[in-house]
């Protein structure tokens, strides 16, 4: 690049070569367009990355002249420089092509916008003012104008919005096509039928053989029905020239409107309604008795329909008030549910326009009046639970049954409902049966021996059913006494606060025989109670010495315990392993235990060796010394004894020992398994 920058820096003839060389050096990404800079991410050095090539410079480059200049310097430059210049020419040609195509695309978009929004017909005589010669609103290429010229219509200065020229337009169209007159009349008659029947579905009327108009409608008309099946009497000779405004006054009149055939007549529920759209002036000129007699029927019918929603609502209110008065005289307060108003389907869809306009304009006033009437007539009713529970003649019976079902209301008197319909002091917490809804699967991928505050057993050596495990998933929450209405956990200074209950729960590690991540042998993976069940055997000891010693040592305490009540073990919170071990102790007490009455409330007694088998006695006597399955390991024995101490601390079991002859060594002597007595 040095030869170009030094020799041809100020020469205008070689300015194109400089731009081409810059494009080849910087690449195709750095171009300055409309003050937008595109930085080059290639490995460029120095200040080359900050250089830009303007769009104007690229457009001013002449590709043929640049190629001629490169050809003239072919002998002076090396092949490397020539190849770089040709690469720059390629980039320049690519950018110029993009610029040209973008400009053409922009011009095309502008032309399309002008063609759609600002196009005007070249020939003013081809503007559409109604129908063309072919009775077609939309023109075609056979005419002097194209489709684009037919998109917009010129405004008609003679158009009057108060007049509706639709009928004249249709008549002109039908007169030009005489063959379609009969079909048009049939279609118009069918439109009248559809309008009066207030429905657009005619699938139920399948019999079309007796229809006079079916033959004239052609094959394109479907879902029609015979005229005999019309629910109302219709005059099909009604003249559409009588256009009625929104105020109900006729704007125009035709000569045929003075005939009787222009009267709109129909029957509704046995009443004949006649609407005559005659001129008001002629009606006033024909005053007298004849006019009053002729209009007596229509006016009377119109007044009946003007009652509308207000008359119907008043009748319903009167009926409801009579029923309520009758029930109040009899002295019955029950059957309130039968007094609720039912939703009725209003089939009266043939109200005159005056009645409909009156109801629409005074809708809010009528609804407010109707609401006030209902509130005035039903102010003595109370919608509380007493009106739903009680029934006629059997108030106490039904109320007792309902209160037995809804146990939350058992401590509320029936007389208090009227004063405090929502002041219930008891709330069902719903935790007693929550254990049946909890999944037994752990969300962790690592096998866990703890679920919440429960340390559950290993599933490999489980002899219990899954129902027993489900009963203890949440630390036996059914044992937590939450009968708040009985006030077990409400203190004296709590003033009946239902949230003041016992939260003295044990920690999550309570009663666990081992930690979760501890390293243990394969033999310790089995359940402790399962290991004890397989290794226990009947004890050969007797309780001859214990009977005498227990009576002498605990005579005073036993007499005091006889006067005390039994311990309520249901209030004690146990984890799963401890409860399972306690059930195992109860089973062993039934099998090998002896009956005792010296330590109430415990009724059975046994030795510790009956619960936790040991190898100590086997080693001394020599019997079954090779049977290693008789005793248990030290880990299992220590864990079982720890659970036994926890039960003794909670008062679930009681531990005692044989008396020692030497009082000096009483506190220093270690007790054997057959010297510790367990009461359960």
UniProtKB/Swiss-Prot annotation:
Proteolytically cleaved by ESP1. Phosphorylated by CDC5. CDC5 phosphorylation is necessary for cleavage by ESP1 and subsequent removal from chromosome arms. Keywords: Centromere, Chromosome, Chromosome partition, Meiosis, Nucleus, Phosphoprotein. Pfam families: Rad21_Rec8_N (PF04825). It is found in: Nucleus; Chromosome; Chromosome, Centromere. Residues 278-297, 431-467, 540-560 are annotated as: Disordered. Induction: During meiosis. Belongs to the rad21 family. GO terms for cellular component: chromosome, centromeric region; cohesin complex; condensed chromosome, centromeric region; condensed nuclear chromosome; meiotic cohesin complex; nucleus. Residues 550-560 have a biased composition (Polar residues). Transmembrane segments: none annotated. This is Meiotic recombination protein REC8. Residues 278-290, 436-446 have a biased composition (Low complexity). The keyword Nucleus applies. Disulfide bonds: none annotated. One of its GO terms (biological process) is meiotic sister chromatid cohesion. One of its GO terms (molecular function) is chromatin binding. Replaces the SCC1 mitosis-specific cohesin to ensure sister chromatid cohesion during meiosis. Is cleaved by ESP1 shortly before the first meiotic division, and dissociates from chromatin, allowing sister chromatids to segregate. Is protected from cleavage by SPO13. Promotes localization of the LINC complex subunit MPS3 on nuclear envelope in mitotic cells. The record marks 431-432, 453-454 as: Cleavage. It comes from Saccharomyces cerevisiae (strain ATCC 204508 / S288c).
């Amino acid at each position: 690049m040095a030869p170009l920058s030094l020799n041809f820096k100020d020469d205008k003839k070689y300015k194109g070569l400089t731009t081409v060389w810059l494009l080849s050096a910087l690449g195709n990404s750095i171009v300055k367009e409309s003050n937008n800079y595109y930085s080059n991410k290639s490995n460029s050095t120095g200040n080359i990355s900050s250089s830009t090539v303007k769009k104007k410079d690229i457009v001013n480059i002449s590709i043929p002249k640049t190629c001629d200049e490169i050809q003239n310097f072919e002998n002076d430059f090396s092949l490397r420089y020539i190849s770089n210049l040709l690469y720059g020419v390629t980039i320049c040609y690519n950018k110029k092509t993009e610029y040209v195509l973008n400009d053409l695309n922009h011009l095309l978009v502008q032309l399309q916008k002008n063609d759609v929004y600002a196009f005007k017909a070249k020939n003013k005589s081809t503007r559409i003012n109604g129908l063309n010669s072919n009775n077609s609103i939309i023109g075609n290429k056979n005419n002097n104008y194209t489709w684009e010229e037919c998109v917009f219509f010129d405004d008609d200065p003679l158009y009057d919005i108060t007049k509706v020229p639709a009928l004249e337009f249709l008549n002109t169209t039908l007169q030009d096509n005489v063959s379609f007159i009969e079909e048009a009349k049939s279609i118009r008659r069918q439109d009248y039928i559809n309008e009066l029947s207030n429905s657009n579905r005619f699938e139920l009327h399948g019999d079309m053989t007796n229809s006079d108009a079916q033959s004239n409608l052609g094959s394109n008309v479907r879902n029609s029905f015979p005229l005999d099946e019309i629910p109302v009497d219709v005059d099909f000779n009604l003249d559409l020239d009588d256009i009625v405004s929104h105020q109900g006054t006729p704007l125009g009149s035709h000569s045929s409107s003075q005939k009787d055939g222009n009267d709109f007549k129909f029957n509704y529920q046995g009443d004949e309604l006649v609407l005559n759209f005659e001129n008001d002036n002629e009606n006033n000129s024909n005053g007298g008795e004849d006019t009053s007699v002729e209009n007596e029927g229509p006016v009377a019918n119109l007044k009946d329909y003007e009652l509308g929603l207000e008359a119907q609502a008043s009748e319903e209110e009167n009926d409801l008030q009579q029923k309520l008065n009758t029930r109040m005289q009899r002295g019955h307060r029950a059957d309130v549910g039968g007094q609720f108003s039912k939703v009725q389907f209003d089939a009266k869809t043939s109200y005159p326009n005056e009645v409909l306009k009156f109801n629409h304009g005074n809708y809010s006033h009528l609804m407010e009046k109707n609401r006030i009437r209902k509130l005035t007539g039903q102010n003595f009713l109370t919608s509380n639970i007493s009106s739903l529970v009680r029934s006629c003649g059997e108030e106490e019976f039904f109320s007792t049954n309902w209160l037995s079902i809804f146990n939350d209301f058992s401590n509320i008197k029936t007389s208090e409902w009227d004063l405090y319909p929502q002041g219930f002091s008891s709330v069902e917490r719903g935790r007693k049966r929550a254990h049946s809804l909890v999944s037994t699967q752990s969300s962790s991928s690592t096998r866990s021996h703890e679920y919440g505050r429960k340390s559950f057993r290993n599933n490999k050596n489980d002899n219990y059913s899954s129902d027993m495990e489900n009963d203890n998933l949440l630390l036996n929450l059914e044992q937590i006494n939450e009968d708040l209405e009985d006030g077990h956990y409400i203190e004296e200074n709590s003033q009946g606060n239902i949230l003041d209950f016992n939260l003295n729960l044990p920690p999550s590690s309570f009663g666990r025989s081992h930690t979760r991540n501890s390293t243990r042998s394969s033999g310790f993976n089995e359940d402790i109670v399962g290991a004890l069940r397989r290794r226990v055997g009947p004890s050969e000891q007797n309780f001859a010495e214990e009977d005498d010693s227990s009576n002498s040592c605990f005579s005073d305490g036993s007499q005091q315990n006889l006067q005390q009540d039994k311990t309520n073990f249901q209030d004690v919170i146990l984890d799963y392993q401890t409860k399972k071990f306690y059930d195992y102790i109860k089973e062993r007490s039934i099998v090998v235990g002896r009956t005792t009455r010296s330590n109430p409330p415990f009724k059975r007694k046994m030795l510790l060796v009956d619960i936790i088998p040991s190898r100590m006695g086997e080693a001394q006597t020599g019997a079954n010394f090779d049977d290693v399955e008789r005793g248990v390991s030290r880990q299992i024995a220590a864990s079982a004894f720890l659970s036994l101490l926890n039960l003794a601390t909670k008062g679930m079991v009681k531990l005692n020992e044989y008396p020692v002859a030497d009082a000096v060594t009483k506190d220093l002597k270690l007790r054997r398994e057959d010297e510790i007595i367990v009461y359960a």
